[in-house]
UniProtKB/Swiss-Prot annotation:
Residues 80-92 have a biased composition (Basic and acidic residues). It comes from the Bacteria. It comes from Clostridium botulinum (strain Alaska E43 / Type E3). PANTHER family: UPF0229 PROTEIN YEAH. Signal peptide: none annotated. Residues 1-23, 75-107 are annotated as: Disordered. HAMAP family: UPF0229. This is UPF0229 protein CLH_2838. Belongs to the UPF0229 family.
Protein backbone atom coordinates (compact mmCIF):
# COMPACT_ATOMS: atom_id res chain seq x y z
CA UNK A 1 0.00 0.00 0.00
CA UNK A 2 1.41 3.38 -1.02
CA UNK A 3 1.96 5.94 1.71
CA UNK A 4 1.84 9.61 0.81
CA UNK A 5 3.48 12.05 3.14
CA UNK A 6 2.28 15.63 3.37
CA UNK A 7 5.27 17.96 3.25
CA UNK A 8 3.42 21.11 2.26
CA UNK A 9 4.00 22.67 5.67
CA UNK A 10 7.76 22.49 5.24
CA UNK A 11 9.39 25.43 3.53
CA UNK A 12 12.03 24.99 0.88
CA UNK A 13 15.41 25.82 2.32
CA UNK A 14 16.69 27.50 -0.81
CA UNK A 15 14.91 29.02 -3.77
CA UNK A 16 17.34 29.64 -6.61
CA UNK A 17 14.93 31.92 -8.46
CA UNK A 18 14.58 34.19 -5.44
CA UNK A 19 18.36 34.33 -5.04
CA UNK A 20 18.80 35.25 -8.72
CA UNK A 21 16.18 37.98 -8.42
CA UNK A 22 17.95 39.37 -5.39
CA UNK A 23 21.30 39.43 -7.18
CA UNK A 24 19.71 41.01 -10.23
CA UNK A 25 18.12 43.73 -8.10
CA UNK A 26 21.48 44.42 -6.45
CA UNK A 27 23.12 44.78 -9.87
CA UNK A 28 20.40 47.16 -11.06
CA UNK A 29 20.67 49.32 -7.94
CA UNK A 30 24.47 49.33 -8.18
CA UNK A 31 24.36 50.37 -11.84
CA UNK A 32 21.84 53.13 -11.14
CA UNK A 33 24.03 54.45 -8.34
CA UNK A 34 27.17 54.34 -10.50
CA UNK A 35 25.44 56.10 -13.40
CA UNK A 36 23.46 58.70 -11.46
CA UNK A 37 26.03 61.40 -12.13
CA UNK A 38 25.87 60.83 -15.89
CA UNK A 39 22.06 60.70 -15.93
CA UNK A 40 21.55 63.79 -13.81
CA UNK A 41 24.02 65.83 -15.86
CA UNK A 42 22.43 64.96 -19.21
CA UNK A 43 21.30 68.05 -21.08
CA UNK A 44 18.15 66.25 -22.19
CA UNK A 45 16.93 65.77 -18.62
CA UNK A 46 15.80 69.40 -18.32
CA UNK A 47 12.13 69.88 -19.05
CA UNK A 48 11.37 66.20 -19.56
CA UNK A 49 8.20 64.51 -18.37
CA UNK A 50 8.17 61.93 -15.60
CA UNK A 51 7.92 59.15 -18.22
CA UNK A 52 11.17 60.12 -19.97
CA UNK A 53 13.37 57.00 -20.09
CA UNK A 54 17.12 56.74 -19.61
CA UNK A 55 19.24 53.71 -20.47
CA UNK A 56 21.60 52.21 -17.91
CA UNK A 57 24.20 49.50 -18.70
CA UNK A 58 24.10 46.45 -16.41
CA UNK A 59 26.43 43.45 -16.37
CA UNK A 60 24.70 40.13 -16.81
CA UNK A 61 24.62 37.40 -14.16
CA UNK A 62 26.35 34.24 -15.37
CA UNK A 63 25.40 30.75 -14.28
CA UNK A 64 27.88 28.84 -12.12
CA UNK A 65 30.08 26.48 -14.14
CA UNK A 66 33.40 24.66 -13.96
CA UNK A 67 36.17 26.12 -16.13
CA UNK A 68 39.74 25.13 -16.89
CA UNK A 69 42.37 26.88 -14.84
CA UNK A 70 45.38 28.73 -16.27
CA UNK A 71 47.81 26.10 -14.98
CA UNK A 72 49.54 28.70 -12.86
CA UNK A 73 51.59 28.02 -9.76
CA UNK A 74 50.29 28.53 -6.27
CA UNK A 75 46.97 28.08 -4.55
CA UNK A 76 44.13 30.56 -4.65
CA UNK A 77 43.63 32.25 -1.30
CA UNK A 78 41.38 35.04 -0.22
CA UNK A 79 41.89 37.99 2.09
CA UNK A 80 38.88 37.29 4.25
CA UNK A 81 36.90 40.24 2.85
CA UNK A 82 35.41 38.42 -0.13
CA UNK A 83 31.68 38.34 -0.71
CA UNK A 84 29.59 35.64 -2.25
CA UNK A 85 30.12 35.55 -6.02
CA UNK A 86 33.60 37.19 -5.98
CA UNK A 87 36.36 35.57 -8.03
CA UNK A 88 39.62 34.54 -6.37
CA UNK A 89 42.56 34.57 -8.76
CA UNK A 90 45.68 32.49 -8.23
CA UNK A 91 49.21 33.01 -9.48
CA UNK A 92 50.19 35.68 -11.97
CA UNK A 93 47.47 36.95 -14.21
CA UNK A 94 48.27 38.21 -17.68
CA UNK A 95 46.23 40.81 -19.44
CA UNK A 96 44.19 38.91 -22.00
CA UNK A 97 41.58 41.31 -23.22
CA UNK A 98 40.71 43.52 -20.26
CA UNK A 99 41.51 46.78 -21.94
CA UNK A 100 45.32 46.59 -21.86
CA UNK A 101 47.76 46.81 -24.75
CA UNK A 102 47.12 44.70 -27.81
CA UNK A 103 44.18 42.60 -28.84
CA UNK A 104 42.89 40.06 -26.33
CA UNK A 105 41.56 36.54 -26.76
CA UNK A 106 39.29 36.26 -23.70
CA UNK A 107 35.55 36.45 -23.73
CA UNK A 108 34.27 39.80 -22.50
CA UNK A 109 31.59 40.48 -19.91
CA UNK A 110 28.06 40.54 -21.21
CA UNK A 111 26.42 43.92 -20.74
CA UNK A 112 22.81 44.79 -21.42
CA UNK A 113 20.82 47.96 -20.96
CA UNK A 114 17.83 48.54 -18.77
CA UNK A 115 15.58 51.58 -18.86
CA UNK A 116 14.58 53.79 -15.95
CA UNK A 117 12.07 56.62 -16.10
CA UNK A 118 12.61 60.04 -14.58
CA UNK A 119 9.84 59.27 -12.10
CA UNK A 120 11.60 56.04 -11.06
CA UNK A 121 14.85 57.97 -10.75
CA UNK A 122 13.18 60.40 -8.34
CA UNK A 123 11.85 57.41 -6.39
CA UNK A 124 15.37 56.01 -6.09
CA UNK A 125 16.68 59.37 -4.88
CA UNK A 126 13.83 59.53 -2.35
CA UNK A 127 14.87 56.18 -0.91
CA UNK A 128 18.48 57.29 -0.56
CA UNK A 129 18.03 60.79 0.82
CA UNK A 130 16.08 62.81 3.37
CA UNK A 131 15.30 66.50 2.97
CA UNK A 132 16.08 69.04 5.65
CA UNK A 133 13.33 68.96 8.26
CA UNK A 134 10.65 71.53 7.49
CA UNK A 135 9.94 73.15 10.83
CA UNK A 136 6.30 73.81 11.66
CA UNK A 137 5.66 77.53 12.02
CA UNK A 138 2.68 79.82 11.81
CA UNK A 139 0.80 79.17 8.63
CA UNK A 140 -0.01 81.88 6.15
CA UNK A 141 -1.07 81.44 2.53
CA UNK A 142 -0.60 77.72 1.97
CA UNK A 143 -3.47 76.27 3.98
CA UNK A 144 -5.58 73.40 2.69
CA UNK A 145 -9.08 72.63 3.96
CA UNK A 146 -9.62 69.10 5.16
CA UNK A 147 -12.71 67.28 6.34
CA UNK A 148 -12.26 67.06 10.07
CA UNK A 149 -14.05 64.80 12.50
CA UNK A 150 -17.80 64.30 12.30
CA UNK A 151 -19.54 66.75 14.61
CA UNK A 152 -23.11 65.52 15.22
CA UNK A 153 -26.02 65.23 12.80
CA UNK A 154 -28.27 67.50 10.77
CA UNK A 155 -31.49 67.18 8.75
CA UNK A 156 -30.03 68.46 5.49
CA UNK A 157 -26.90 67.48 3.63
CA UNK A 158 -25.44 65.70 0.62
CA UNK A 159 -26.11 62.04 -0.12
CA UNK A 160 -22.54 60.78 0.59
CA UNK A 161 -22.89 62.04 4.18
CA UNK A 162 -26.17 60.22 4.84
CA UNK A 163 -26.12 58.67 8.34
CA UNK A 164 -27.99 55.45 7.59
CA UNK A 165 -28.16 54.13 11.13
CA UNK A 166 -29.40 57.42 12.54
CA UNK A 167 -31.94 57.68 9.68
CA UNK A 168 -33.37 54.24 10.48
CA UNK A 169 -33.54 55.18 14.16
CA UNK A 170 -35.49 58.33 13.27
CA UNK A 171 -37.94 56.28 11.22
CA UNK A 172 -38.45 53.75 14.04
CA UNK A 173 -38.98 56.58 16.52
CA UNK A 174 -41.62 58.13 14.27
CA UNK A 175 -43.31 54.74 13.82
CA UNK A 176 -43.43 54.14 17.58
CA UNK A 177 -44.82 57.61 18.18
CA UNK A 178 -47.62 56.97 15.71
CA UNK A 179 -48.36 53.60 17.34
CA UNK A 180 -48.63 55.17 20.80
CA UNK A 181 -50.87 57.92 19.49
CA UNK A 182 -53.28 55.42 17.92
CA UNK A 183 -53.39 53.30 21.07
CA UNK A 184 -54.15 56.36 23.21
CA UNK A 185 -57.03 57.23 20.89
CA UNK A 186 -58.38 53.71 21.27
CA UNK A 187 -57.82 52.83 17.65
CA UNK A 188 -56.47 49.52 16.42
CA UNK A 189 -52.88 49.62 15.20
CA UNK A 190 -52.29 47.44 12.19
CA UNK A 191 -48.80 46.57 10.99
CA UNK A 192 -48.45 47.89 7.50
CA UNK A 193 -45.77 49.30 5.23
CA UNK A 194 -44.15 52.26 6.89
CA UNK A 195 -41.98 54.11 4.32
CA UNK A 196 -39.19 56.59 4.94
CA UNK A 197 -40.01 60.27 4.78
CA UNK A 198 -37.88 63.32 4.19
CA UNK A 199 -38.12 64.18 7.88
CA UNK A 200 -36.41 60.87 8.79
CA UNK A 201 -33.21 61.61 6.92
CA UNK A 202 -30.17 62.45 9.00
CA UNK A 203 -26.78 63.58 7.69
CA UNK A 204 -23.39 63.78 9.32
CA UNK A 205 -22.39 67.29 10.27
CA UNK A 206 -18.77 67.79 9.24
CA UNK A 207 -16.77 70.71 10.54
CA UNK A 208 -14.22 72.02 8.05
CA UNK A 209 -10.90 72.58 9.73
CA UNK A 210 -7.76 74.16 8.27
CA UNK A 211 -5.08 71.58 7.64
CA UNK A 212 -1.69 72.90 8.61
CA UNK A 213 1.13 72.15 6.21
CA UNK A 214 4.79 73.08 6.33
CA UNK A 215 5.23 76.28 4.38
CA UNK A 216 8.47 76.09 2.42
CA UNK A 217 9.85 78.14 -0.44
CA UNK A 218 12.83 77.25 -2.60
CA UNK A 219 14.52 80.22 -4.27
CA UNK A 220 16.70 79.20 -7.21
CA UNK A 221 19.31 81.78 -8.23
CA UNK A 222 21.49 81.25 -11.31
CA UNK A 223 24.42 83.19 -12.72
CA UNK A 224 23.61 83.78 -16.41
CA UNK A 225 26.67 85.89 -17.25
CA UNK A 226 29.01 85.46 -20.20
CA UNK A 227 31.54 83.39 -18.21
CA UNK A 228 28.85 80.74 -17.75
CA UNK A 229 29.30 78.89 -21.04
CA UNK A 230 26.74 76.43 -22.42
CA UNK A 231 28.22 73.46 -20.52
CA UNK A 232 28.06 75.27 -17.18
CA UNK A 233 24.54 76.53 -17.82
CA UNK A 234 23.29 73.08 -18.77
CA UNK A 235 24.91 71.68 -15.64
CA UNK A 236 23.29 74.37 -13.47
CA UNK A 237 19.90 73.77 -15.05
CA UNK A 238 20.21 70.02 -14.55
CA UNK A 239 21.12 70.65 -10.92
CA UNK A 240 18.12 72.91 -10.32
CA UNK A 241 15.74 70.79 -12.40
CA UNK A 242 16.42 67.58 -10.46
CA UNK A 243 16.23 69.51 -7.20
CA UNK A 244 12.85 71.02 -8.10
CA UNK A 245 11.39 67.73 -9.38
CA UNK A 246 12.47 65.92 -6.25
CA UNK A 247 11.06 68.59 -3.93
CA UNK A 248 7.74 68.72 -5.79
CA UNK A 249 7.47 64.97 -5.47
CA UNK A 250 8.37 64.98 -1.78
CA UNK A 251 6.17 67.85 -0.61
CA UNK A 252 2.76 69.03 -1.82
CA UNK A 253 2.84 72.52 -0.38
CA UNK A 254 6.08 74.08 -1.51
CA UNK A 255 6.56 77.32 -3.43
CA UNK A 256 9.29 77.98 -5.99
CA UNK A 257 10.83 81.26 -7.07
CA UNK A 258 13.34 81.70 -9.89
CA UNK A 259 15.96 84.42 -10.28
CA UNK A 260 18.75 84.75 -12.80
CA UNK A 261 21.24 87.56 -13.08
CA UNK A 262 24.19 89.10 -14.88
CA UNK A 263 24.97 92.52 -13.43
CA UNK A 264 21.23 92.94 -12.92
CA UNK A 265 18.91 90.34 -11.41
CA UNK A 266 15.47 89.41 -12.73
CA UNK A 267 12.63 87.31 -11.38
CA UNK A 268 11.53 84.92 -14.10
CA UNK A 269 9.11 82.06 -14.66
CA UNK A 270 10.13 78.44 -14.30
CA UNK A 271 10.15 77.96 -18.07
CA UNK A 272 12.34 81.01 -18.66
CA UNK A 273 14.71 79.92 -15.92
CA UNK A 274 15.35 76.54 -17.54
CA UNK A 275 15.34 77.63 -21.18
CA UNK A 276 16.41 81.28 -21.53
CA UNK A 277 20.04 82.39 -21.87
CA UNK A 278 21.76 85.76 -21.48
CA UNK A 279 25.26 87.21 -21.53
CA UNK A 280 27.02 90.02 -19.76
CA UNK A 281 29.08 90.76 -16.68
CA UNK A 282 28.70 89.30 -13.21
CA UNK A 283 27.54 90.88 -9.98
CA UNK A 284 26.83 87.96 -7.66
CA UNK A 285 25.38 90.34 -5.11
CA UNK A 286 22.61 91.36 -7.52
CA UNK A 287 21.03 87.90 -7.51
CA UNK A 288 21.28 87.50 -3.74
CA UNK A 289 19.95 91.00 -3.00
CA UNK A 290 16.99 90.30 -5.30
CA UNK A 291 16.29 87.13 -3.29
CA UNK A 292 16.42 89.14 -0.05
CA UNK A 293 13.94 91.65 -1.47
CA UNK A 294 11.68 88.79 -2.55
CA UNK A 295 11.73 87.32 0.97
CA UNK A 296 10.89 90.71 2.48
CA UNK A 297 7.92 91.12 0.12
CA UNK A 298 6.34 87.65 0.17
CA UNK A 299 7.91 85.24 2.63
CA UNK A 300 8.20 86.35 6.29
CA UNK A 301 10.87 84.17 7.95
CA UNK A 302 8.61 83.70 10.99
CA UNK A 303 6.03 81.93 8.81
CA UNK A 304 8.10 80.25 6.11
CA UNK A 305 10.91 77.75 5.78
CA UNK A 306 13.21 79.46 3.29
CA UNK A 307 15.84 77.63 1.21
CA UNK A 308 17.72 79.78 -1.34
CA UNK A 309 20.14 77.90 -3.60
CA UNK A 310 22.65 79.68 -5.83
CA UNK A 311 24.68 78.32 -8.77
CA UNK A 312 27.63 80.04 -10.44
CA UNK A 313 31.06 79.35 -11.88
CA UNK A 314 32.57 81.48 -9.12
CA UNK A 315 33.80 84.32 -11.35
CA UNK A 316 32.74 87.74 -10.10
CA UNK A 317 33.59 91.36 -10.80
CA UNK A 318 36.22 92.16 -8.16
CA UNK A 319 34.52 95.38 -7.05
CA UNK A 320 31.43 93.34 -6.11
CA UNK A 321 33.19 90.75 -3.94
CA UNK A 322 32.74 92.51 -0.59
CA UNK A 323 29.08 93.27 -1.31
CA UNK A 324 28.52 89.65 -2.38
CA UNK A 325 29.97 88.34 0.89
CA UNK A 326 27.85 90.73 2.96
CA UNK A 327 24.69 89.82 1.04
CA UNK A 328 25.31 86.10 1.66
CA UNK A 329 25.71 86.79 5.39
CA UNK A 330 22.45 88.72 5.35
CA UNK A 331 20.44 86.06 3.52
CA UNK A 332 21.78 83.36 5.86
CA UNK A 333 20.22 85.23 8.80
CA UNK A 334 16.71 85.04 7.31
CA UNK A 335 16.93 81.57 5.74
CA UNK A 336 16.90 78.03 7.02
CA UNK A 337 19.71 77.19 4.63
CA UNK A 338 21.63 78.96 1.90
CA UNK A 339 23.24 76.65 -0.63
CA UNK A 340 26.09 77.73 -2.91
CA UNK A 341 27.07 75.47 -5.81
CA UNK A 342 30.15 76.33 -7.87
CA UNK A 343 30.22 74.77 -11.34
CA UNK A 344 33.39 73.91 -13.29
CA UNK A 345 35.40 76.67 -11.56
CA UNK A 346 38.44 78.25 -13.15
CA UNK A 347 41.81 76.85 -12.05
CA UNK A 348 43.67 80.08 -12.80
CA UNK A 349 41.99 82.43 -10.33
CA UNK A 350 40.65 82.13 -6.81
CA UNK A 351 36.89 81.79 -7.08
CA UNK A 352 34.14 82.96 -4.74
CA UNK A 353 33.91 79.49 -3.20
CA UNK A 354 37.13 80.09 -1.27
CA UNK A 355 36.20 83.67 -0.38
CA UNK A 356 32.78 82.65 0.92
CA UNK A 357 34.14 79.78 3.02
CA UNK A 358 36.83 82.04 4.48
CA UNK A 359 34.54 84.92 5.42
CA UNK A 360 31.20 83.23 6.21
CA UNK A 361 30.86 81.24 9.43
CA UNK A 362 27.08 80.75 9.54
CA UNK A 363 26.12 77.13 10.23
CA UNK A 364 23.35 77.18 7.64
CA UNK A 365 25.73 78.10 4.81
CA UNK A 366 26.36 75.03 2.65
CA UNK A 367 28.82 75.11 -0.25
CA UNK A 368 29.69 72.50 -2.86
CA UNK A 369 32.02 72.40 -5.86
CA UNK A 370 31.15 70.55 -9.05
CA UNK A 371 34.42 70.15 -10.95
CA UNK A 372 33.03 67.63 -13.44
CA UNK A 373 29.68 66.12 -14.36
CA UNK A 374 30.01 63.10 -12.09
CA UNK A 375 30.26 65.44 -9.06
CA UNK A 376 26.66 66.56 -9.59
CA UNK A 377 25.21 63.61 -7.69
CA UNK A 378 27.49 64.14 -4.68
CA UNK A 379 26.60 67.85 -4.66
CA UNK A 380 22.89 67.03 -4.66
CA UNK A 381 23.36 64.56 -1.80
CA UNK A 382 25.25 67.14 0.24
CA UNK A 383 22.58 69.77 -0.32
CA UNK A 384 19.59 67.51 0.27
CA UNK A 385 20.88 65.61 3.28
CA UNK A 386 21.82 68.71 5.24
CA UNK A 387 19.72 68.98 8.39
CA UNK A 388 19.32 72.43 9.82
CA UNK A 389 19.14 73.30 13.48
CA UNK A 390 17.73 76.71 14.27
CA UNK A 391 18.67 78.57 17.39
Amino acid sequence: MAIFRDRTDKQVDHDRAIEDKRRHRQLVEKSIKENLGDILSEESIVGQSKNKKFKIPIKSIKEYQFVYGKNSKGVATGTGEEKRGDKIESGSKKAMGKGNKGAGNEEGDEVYETEITLDELMEYISDELNLPNLDEKKYSEIITDSCGKKKGYQRHGIRPRLAKKRTVMAKISRKQSKKRALIEEGKDYKTERFPFREEDLRYYKVKMQPKKASNAVMIFIMDASGSMDSTKKYLARSYFFVLSRFLKRKYNNIAFEFIYHTTVAKRVSEYEFFHKSESGGTYISSGIVEAINLIDEKYPPSEWNIYPVYASDGDNWSEDNIKAIESVKEICKISNMFGYAELLPSTYTQTMYYKFNKEINEKNFISVVIKEKKDLWEALKTMLKQELKED
